[in-house]
Amino acid sequence: AVIDDTPTILRTVAILDFEGKGINLQEVQTLTERMRTEIGNTKAVRLIERKAIENIMAEQGLAQSGCVTDECAAEVGQLLGVQYMINGILGKMGDSYTIDAKMFSVETGETVQAVNTTYEGEIEGLLLEMQILSWEIVGLDVPPRLKLQRAGETEKPTMAVIDFDGRG
């Protein structure tokens, strides 16, 4: 059998800071940064650094928090030379938080993947939800460790203790 060792060309992606509705800007930026970090951990895409995005936006006289339309995101994506952009909304309704994120083609504007979740609890719990959505938005299975964390469990090693009487 011939093994194809041609390097896989990774899709290039940039993530804009999410839009916050009922959540303060620092929390939105922290949660967006968690998604950036976790998407980097997936190794499924080539991620553009936040600083590069900020530089392009500064040159264009745009603020990340003000670039909430798909048109603005696509324009930034073209300037960055990326294939895909990820943007989204973090919202608060009563005691619930919502996360809606999508990855779309800069060239066509077509949404290639959309994910969302609703979370009830303290805002810190959204950090884990952002990690889980990061895997889903790039089309990969969520690692068991994250599923366990969501279920309130931690990874525990499995052990067996066997008595040997040593008498062969």
Identify the residue ranges that each predicted region occupies.
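Generic signal for short, ordered secondary-structure residues
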Residues: 17-18, 55-56, 109
